[in-house]
Amino acid sequence: MISFNNVSKVYESGGQSVHAVEDVTLSVEKGEIFGIIGFSGAGKSTLLRLVNMLERPTAGTISIDDKDITSLSTKELRKLRQRIGMIFQSFNLFNSRTVFGNIAYPLKLAKVPKNEIKERVNELLKFVGLEDKANNYPEQLSGGQKQRVGIARALATSPDILICDEATSALDPETTTEILNLLKKVNREYNLTILLITHEMHVVKEICHRVAVMEKGKVIEEGKLFDVFTQPKTTTTQNFVRSVINDHLPESVLAKIQNGGQIYRLTFTGEETGQPVLSYIAKNYNVDVNVLYGNIIELQNVLFGNLLVELQGEQREIQKALQHLRLQVQLKEVEAHAS
């Protein structure tokens, strides 16, 4: 649905060229939630602004439904933007308008008849759970309620695409979960394509089908959520994943391990997570198993387990145990200082 083809955006600053986005090629499929994650300055926000042509690319093309939007006329561009809703970190509500008025605003701009505006706004108020807040002003709302208004306003013109710019960054953890659940509901019930940017990996984990990692204007890794989480290739991606799966061991534990024993990382997927593999090798081989770290998370309805274990015993027995483990799970030896 959305395609970036060798897209670059260059700014001139102090006589130097700054590559905010550099040679990005990405495809976002219709009906999916696609996340773009990166630290500040990675180029995420610039890439989003290129989708609705608030910024024009210096090079490359951007297509929506196989149509090159970089060549659209002003009139065609105005029509395109009606298909794209957007929500922001800072909500961007009109403080002088009620909740009803904020949601109705894009419909008035589109010259929708008053009776249809009322019907649509009431429908959206119910959808986002704010039926009793129609006459309230933004200052009377919590942060989560303000973002619900922002989502309703973004949906007002029945867009095909919803762009989310750090939509949960200003919210507490509980409210973040509520907003992410609402966005999943939007995606599910309206079959809306959602393109979001964030610097928080737990947001990606909770909501995205696929994800791209940006650094210094470039996409350095991209793929299905499960693949990126379970097999991160770059150091930056590995650091993001560790913000959700923190498997670094304390120095005091590492010091003891370095005096003996071997560390292995075991990863389980799907039904493997329920198998008693460690108890089996402890019973059937002369090996002591010390679990140093354990974690199980769910990624797009698939379980992923991650264990760090220390094996102690005679080398021959350890090798027998490892041979059995390799038949059951993914196994990798880990140096103590690199755990």
UniProtKB/Swiss-Prot annotation:
ATP binds at G38, F39, S40, G41, A42, G43, K44, S45. It is found in: Cell membrane. Gene3D superfamilies: 3.30.70.260, P-loop containing nucleotide triphosphate hydrolases. It catalyses: L-methionine(out) + ATP + H2O = L-methionine(in) + ADP + phosphate + H(+); D-methionine(out) + ATP + H2O = D-methionine(in) + ADP + phosphate + H(+). Keywords: Amino-acid transport, ATP-binding, Cell membrane, Membrane, Nucleotide-binding, Translocase, Transport. InterPro entries: AAA+_ATPase, ABC_transporter-like_ATP-bd, ABC_transporter-like_CS, ACT-like_dom_sf, MetN_ABC, MetN_ABC_transporter-like, NIL_domain, P-loop_NTPase. Residues 2-241 form the ABC transporter domain. SUPFAM superfamilies: ACT-like, P-loop containing nucleoside triphosphate hydrolases. It is a peripheral membrane protein. Its EC number is 7.4.2.11. One of its GO terms (molecular function) is ABC-type D-methionine transporter activity. GO terms for cellular component: plasma membrane. It comes from the Bacteria. Part of the ABC transporter complex MetNIQ involved in methionine import. Responsible for energy coupling to the transport system. Belongs to the ABC transporter superfamily. Methionine importer (TC 3.A.1.24) family. The complex is composed of two ATP-binding proteins (MetN), two transmembrane proteins (MetI) and a solute-binding protein (MetQ). This is Methionine import ATP-binding protein MetN 2. It comes from Bacillus anthracis. The lineage of its organism: Bacteria, Bacillati, Bacillota, Bacilli, Bacillales.
